[in-house]
Structure formats: structure tokens, C-alpha cells
């Protein structure tokens, strides 16, 4: 039996986007070919806080998705202040303790911001101190706290102060309104792997090249397990 047959699937904790849910994120990933998805053990969870506001405040989320909808934390309009971020981190660690262990994280949008910050916070000893080290992250339409457009939550001022050596796969959409945030995030990781696609702020469909990029990244991760 060769090494490829012995390689196990990476177990991945998945963080959905702002005002959606674990179920919705799971459905969004169905656009990926089955041969890509079956390479991983993906575990989808709901964020700890119900989406705030009425239909008008929920906006597009209320139009596109069926409730219940959730969010990981809250911020003011210019992202200079955050609420419930510490509680969010505690919730994540509890999830990883109860239903783990996990090898890595995957996040979309708000979930990608969270996923991107956690390896640095864990290395600093301010988060995820009771669970195994995060071995990799996959970030779809992400960005970084402390970047050009977002301040840092009080718990995470140093999340990106040192280069993050954790292997990372970054999905960058040509039509994504947050593309500059995703590009800025690349500088915080050592040897980031980039998957470019022509779509917007979405979990993208994968062409042959995109599927190949994902498979190669996953196989690289399997060598670390």
C-alpha cells in the first residue's frame, strides 16, 4: 500500500459568511466537484449569534437565504469597534474541544476573517490554547484585522504581527468587492497558495485549473498529517 492510499482526509472546521449559517455554507460548497470535496472531512457549524436587525437591516441576506441566520461577531459601520469577539473565540475553542480534533479551518467572508486571524492568535497564546495547533487555513473572500479597512479587535492586535507560517489557500475573485482585502492578506502568510477566479464575493465554481490547485494543496496538507 503506497503513501497516497495511507493518507487520511484533513478534518476541517468551516466558518460561514456573515448572516448565513453552516447549512448554507455547506450548500455553497456543493458547486465544487465531488472529487475535490471528498478529499476533505468538512464540518460546518453555525456562528454563536443570531443575525441582528429586521428585514431592512438584514438586506440581501434575508432575500437570498432562509432563516435561521447567524453572525460570528458584530462591528460598527467603519469596523473600528467590535462586539462579542471574545465570546466568538471562546465559542470556537469550545467547538474544537467538543467535536474536534481538527486539522485546519476554512472560512468564507466574515468566517474567512476569523479563520485568518486564529493561527496568529494561537501562536501568541491568546486563543485556542487547549486544542491542537492549526495546520492550515483555506480563506474564501477574506481579509485581515488591522488592514487598510478594518481595525483589530482588542483580543487580536498582534494576530498578524509576525509572518504566519501556517499553509494557506486564498480564493481571490476578480469581481469580488473585497478583492483588495484578500490581496492585502496575502502578505501576512508565508508562501500563500492563490486560487484566482473570475467571480465575485461567492464560494466559486472551480474550473480545471482551480480544482487542480485545491487538490495539490490538500495533498500537500496530507503530507503534514
What are these regions (language model features)?
Residues 103-115:
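Gly/Ala-rich beta-loop-alpha elbow adjacent to hydrolase catalytic centers
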Residues 163-164, 168-172:
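Short beta-strand/loop motif that positions the catalytic acidic residue
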Residues 207-225:
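Catalytic active-site module of serine/aspartate enzymes centered on a nucleophile-bearing elbow/loop
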Amino acid at each position: 500500500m503506497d503513501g497516497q492510499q495511507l493518507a487520511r482526509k484533513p478534518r476541517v472546521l468551516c466558518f460561514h459568511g456573515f448572516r448565513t449559517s453552516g447549512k448554507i455554507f455547506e450548500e455553497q460548497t456543493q458547486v465544487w466537484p465531488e472529487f475535490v470535496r471528498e478529499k476533505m472531512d468538512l464540518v460546518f457549524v453555525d456562528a454563536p449569534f443570531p443575525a441582528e436587525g429586521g428585514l431592512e437591516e438584514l438586506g440581501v441576506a434575508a432575500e437570498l437565504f432562509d432563516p435561521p441566520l447567524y453572525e460570528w461577531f458584530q462591528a460598527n459601520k467603519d469596523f473600528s469597534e467590535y462586539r462579542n469577539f471574545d465570546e466568538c473565540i471562546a465559542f470556537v475553542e469550545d467547538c474544537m474541544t467538543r467535536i474536534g480534533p481538527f486539522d485546519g479551518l476554512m472560512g468564507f467572508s466574515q468566517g474567512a476573517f476569523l479563520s485568518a486571524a486564529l493561527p496568529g492568535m494561537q501562536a501568541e497564546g491568546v486563543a485556542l490554547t487547549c486544542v491542537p495547533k492549526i495546520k492550515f487555513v483555506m480563506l474564501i473572500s477574506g481579509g485581515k484585522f488591522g488592514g487598510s479597512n478594518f481595525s483589530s479587535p482588542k483580543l487580536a492586535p498582534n494576530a498578524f504581527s509576525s509572518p504566519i507560517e501556517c499553509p494557506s489557500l486564498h480564493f481571490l475573485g476578480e469581481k469580488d468587492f473585497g478583492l483588495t482585502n484578500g490581496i492585502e492578506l496575502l502578505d501576512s502568510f508565508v508562501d500563500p497558495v492563490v486560487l484566482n477566479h473570475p467571480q465575485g464575493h461567492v464560494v466559486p465554481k472551480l474550473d480545471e485549473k482551480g480544482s487542480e490547485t485545491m487538490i495539490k494543496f490538500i495533498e500537500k496538507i496530507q503530507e503534514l498529517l
